[in-house]
A protein has these predicted regions:
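A glycine/threonine-rich phosphate-anchoring loop and its flanking beta-alpha core
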Residues: 9, 112-212
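Glycine-rich beta-strand-to-loop/alpha-helix junction loops that act as flexible
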Residues: 38-39, 95-97, 233
Length: 305
């Protein structure tokens, strides 16, 4: 049974908070070299650019690593080892959804131990080292997995199968839940993220290891998704902030409730494809049975796109 809440060292969660959060890297941590981990689509769309610009304004050198495909593979991660060795970053910054943030977590682990067997580490989390060479910063650009606050990294194994790492050493020094990054999400993306976030929260809420502390966060997350998804789909910035915070709460909670996640469970963060499954819909129906208000309106909003 859980006896302590394991969370990022510092959690920023207001619109526009990214520059304030990153200021710490120069002012407090005296970082000089940052490895920016992101998805090519986000980079081309300019979504990651404000992060790189902010780092450079603090005279922090920036190198980039781009994830490939919908889930980062062992091979992709291994290909980054020469860059890690040559560039010697003192901070790794993951910007994106679950895929980019999982890649940043795995690279931190490999930076700490380049010989780490990722498949073996998935079976034995004690193998995952604490990395003394770099801090980890995670910046979420959607509200599906809440990975910026969770100890999970979801990777693609040698045979294409999903491999899940979990360790408190994969929690970031700083997590950033800045709703300004969600402004470009379409109504359909908002719907899909809302269903996925609700699925995570409901499954963790029903888990036998859910405690009073995690239940409080999950109750808030479930209620927010049900109440604000329709408004967020219609473009409301304040509603998108609510959903972004709800996903952050869900991620922080299921990371403290669930010992392991597998691809067949609905709270499994599926990466950038973020497809809606029947399990996600069933979890939304479970929320109604649990007595949460607003389920009918939520279903109607989801069916409208």
């Amino acid at each position: 049974m859980l006896q302590a809440l394991n969370l990022p060292k510092k959690v920023y969660f207001k619109p526009g908070c990214m520059p304030v959060a990153l200021r710490e890297l120069g002012d407090i941590y005296r970082c000089q070299r940052a490895l920016l981990v992101t998805d090519p689509e986000l980079y081309r769309a300019g979504i990651a650019a404000p992060v790189a610009d902010r780092l450079r304004k603090q005279e922090i050198r920036v190198a980039e690593f781009f994830t490939i495909g919908k889930r980062v593979s062992f091979g992709d991660l291994r290909s980054a080892l020469p860059k890690l060795s040559e560039f010697q970053p003192d901070v790794i910054v993951g910007v994106g959804g679950n895929n980019a943030m999982s890649a940043a977590k795995a690279l931190l682990a490999l930076y700490g131990d380049p010989d780490l067997d990722l498949a073996a580490a998935a079976a034995d989390p004690a193998r995952i080292p604490a990395c003394a060479k770099a801090k980890l910063v995670l910046i979420a650009t959607n509200f599906s997995s809440g990975s910026q606050n969770s100890p999970f990294a979801i990777l693609k194994g040698e045979e294409g199968q999903a491999i899940v790492l979990k360790s408190i050493h994969l929690l970031p020094e700083i997590s950033v839940t800045d709703a300004d990054f969600t402004a470009g999400l379409t109504a359909e993306q908002v719907r899909t993220c809302g269903l996925k976030s609700l699925s995570h929260a409901v499954r963790a809420y029903l888990d036998p290891d859910c405690t009073e502390l995690t239940a409080g966060m999950l109750t808030e997350a479930i209620a927010a998704v049900l109440k604000y998804t329709e408004r967020a789909m219609n473009g409301s910035p304040s509603a998108r902030e609510k959903l972004h915070n709800a996903a952050a709460l869900a991620g922080a909670s299921y990371g403290n409730v669930v010992d392991a996640i597998t691809p067949d469970l609905p709270y499994f963060p599926t990466g950038e494809e973020i497809t809606v499954s029947d399990n996600d819909v069933r979890c939304a129906e479970l929320a109604e049975r649990l007595g949460f208000a607003g389920c009918r309106d939520f279903f109607s909003a989801c069916q409208s796109v």
